């Protein structure tokens, strides 16, 4: 089900942010800079945290989502802790308020599917914040491999242990980004999952080596951990005719092609835009509200990526195929 487009007259969308953690602050900052958005307020139970942020951005701070909705919010960004996503999004959806939910969509796939169904029944837009899709280095890689016979994808996403306390490990915090990217780049279902997990220094897994096979035959690998002293984000894609390397931090993309019998090849650096990914993500959400376009990441897609991540966490039992219908999710366009 699609929602009725807002603001055909070009007026700004009244939008609020729930949660004043790292991502909530970033969402609020970017929304305050977007002409199409009217940041009506930010909500957090800790007003001592929320009020200085609100003052800096020229908006209001309130203590809960109910107050934010009462201020006339037409849409909300939910950037609260994951275990609160389902309850907060349900409150918004039942009031007819459109929602962008930070990844993962919910604590588990069942809650995620429930939100998708509720949004469909209510006729509101539901988008999931898989921000790496909007990294222009990733978008350049996708364009470079368009119509290519993809053979393999290898993604590295590593860094130091996060300073903030978290109730999840690297699979949900980091690898779920790359599960989404593998599905998006290949436009194919992930049908096999082979995870190797370890908790070297943390209570939850802080090392994950994840292998996948897609329905189209692509072999994919994710290497992620919290043990590397520096951040690194790289993607390597091998196709029948080229090899593409993307650095998601520096946003440099290199394409190797034209392999010759003597082992030589041609190499070129592809042009990459440098717009902040979060700005592109929020613009996609606002466009979905004002033009009835499909949001950049649908609720269905968010649920599928979470389901595959949960299969990885299941350890050895995750060797059972993890089947997800990418084509059906796109066709339904449930938001």
Label each region the model flagged.
Residues 1-9, 67, 75-77, 286-335:
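C-terminal helix-rich "cap/oligomerization" subdomain common to oxidoreductases
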Residues 26, 45, 270-283, 297:
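Active-site loop of classical SDR/Rossmann-like NAD(P)-dependent oxidoreductases
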Residues 179-252, 279-292, 327-335:
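Contiguous beta-strand/loop segments that form the cofactor/metal-binding neighborhood of enzyme cores
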Residues 1-57, 71:
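N-terminal Rossmann-like dinucleotide-binding module
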Residues 129-136, 161-190, 301-302:
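Mid-domain beta-loop-alpha active-site segment that forms a flexible
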Residues 27, 57-115:
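Beta-loop-alpha module in the N-terminal Rossmann-like domain of NAD(P)-dependent dehydrogenases
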Residues 41, 75, 152, 219:
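Short, Asp-centered acidic motifs that coordinate Mg2+ and/or phosphate
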Residues 106-162:
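A contiguous active-site-proximal alpha/beta segment in oxidoreductase catalytic domains
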């Amino acid at each position: 089900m699609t929602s009725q487009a807002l603001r055909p007259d070009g007026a700004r969308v009244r939008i609020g942010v729930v949660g004043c953690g790292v991502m909530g602050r970033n969402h609020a900052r970017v929304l305050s800079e977007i002409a199409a958005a009217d940041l009506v307020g930010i909500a957090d139970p800790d007003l001592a945290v929320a009020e200085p942020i609100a003052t800096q951005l020229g908006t209001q701070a309130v203590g809960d989502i109910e107050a934010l909705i009462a201020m006339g919010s037409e849409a909300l960004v939910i950037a609260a802790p994951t275990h609160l996503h389902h309850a907060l999004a349900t409150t918004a959806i039942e009031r007819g308020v459109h929602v962008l939910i930070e990844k993962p969509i919910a604590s588990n796939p069942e809650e995620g599917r429930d939100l998708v169904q509720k949004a469909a029944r209510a006729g509101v837009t539901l988008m999931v914040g898989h921000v790496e899709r909007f990294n222009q280095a990733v978008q350049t890689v996708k364009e470079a491999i368009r119509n290519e016979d993809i053979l393999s994808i290898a993604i590295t996403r590593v860094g130091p242990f996060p300073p903030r306390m978290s109730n999840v490990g690297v699979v949900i915090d980091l690898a779920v980004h790359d599960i989404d990217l593998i599905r998006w780049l290949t436009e194919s279902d992930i049908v096999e999952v082979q995870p190797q997990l370890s908790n070297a220094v943390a209570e939850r897994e802080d090392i994950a080596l994840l292998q996948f096979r897609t329905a189209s035959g692509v072999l994919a690998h994710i290497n992620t951990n919290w043990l590397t002293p520096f951040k690194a984000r790289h993607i390597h894609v091998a196709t029948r005719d080229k090899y593409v390397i993307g650095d998601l931090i520096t946003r440099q993309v290199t394409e190797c092609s034209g392999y010759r019998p003597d082992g030589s090849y041609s190499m070129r650096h592809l042009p990459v835009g440098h717009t902040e990914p979060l700005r592109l993500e929020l613009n996609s959400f606002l466009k979905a509200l004002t033009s009835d376009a499909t949001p950049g990441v649908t609720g269905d897609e968010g649920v599928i990526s979470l389901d595959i991540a949960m299969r990885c966490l299941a350890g050895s039992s995750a060797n059972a195929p993890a089947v997800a219908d990418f084509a059906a999710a796109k066709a339904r366009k449930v938001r």
